[in-house]
Regions:
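Short, aromatic- and glycine-rich surface loops/edge beta-strands on solvent-exposed regions
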Residues: 102-114
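Solvent-exposed serine/threonine-rich low-complexity stretches and specific carbohydrate-binding patches
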Residues: 77-87
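Transition segment at domain starts
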Residues: 23-48, 135-150
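A composition-driven surface/loop motif
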Residues: 51-53, 58, 119, 129-133
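Short acidic/polar inter-strand loop motif in beta-rich domains
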Residues: 111-124
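Exposed aromatic-hydrophobic patches
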Residues: 53-54, 88-98
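Short, surface-exposed binding/anchoring microloops in extracellular/periplasmic proteins
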Residues: 30-76
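Secretory targeting signatures
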Residues: 1-28, 160
Length: 160
């Protein structure tokens, strides 16, 4: 009978350890397997709005994939976002404002930590992190029906 209780205790302990390790640490927003896969692409749309496609988003919990323009090599303003489910999401279409889009964009994965289904930035829907790093991927875009900005070329003294 005592072996029976030891087995039950061991199984319960293993289950609890598994649940704890799979959770996000709310204090640091650390996740273990969050990721983004996105390839360079052409924006589908016109000079005002268009769509980009994120090949794959793996999110720990519900969240949003957010597209930022490029502000001198760093994420600038938010130009589009769409919700994602917990787990793997494939071929995620994000509608963006092409009139403020740059030729390099950043895809950033955010938690849905506030009102469910509403993107509340910058808080409480902060970026997901893995090993202390924000889950972010830059990608290049072109467009046939819109002029994309290149802010680096607009810098004073930059001849490119």
């Amino acid at each position: 009978m005592q072996k029976h209780w030891l087995v039950i205790a061991a199984v319960l302990a293993a289950c609890c350890i598994g649940l704890v390790s799979a959770q996000t640490d709310a204090g640091t927003n650390e996740t273990t397997n969050a990721s983004i896969t996105v390839t360079d692409q052409m924006v589908e749309g016109d000079a005002v709005v268009g769509n980009v496609t994120v090949d794959e988003v793996v999110s720990n919990g519900t969240g949003c994939i957010v597209i930022h323009n490029n502000l001198f090599g760093h994420p600038g303003g938010v130009i589009g976002y769409t919700p994602v489910e917990s787990g793997t999401n494939r071929n995620v279409t994000v509608t963006i404002h092409t009139f403020v889009a740059t030729d390099t964009l950043f895809a950033v994965l955010h938690h849905d930590a506030g009102k469910v289904g509403v993107f509340e930035y910058p808080i409480p829907d902060i970026e997901q992190k893995v090993e202390g790093e924000i889950v972010i991927v830059p990608f290049n875009v072109t467009a046939e029906n819109a002029t994309l900005l290149n802010l680096t070329s607009l810098c004073p003294g930059n001849s490119t």
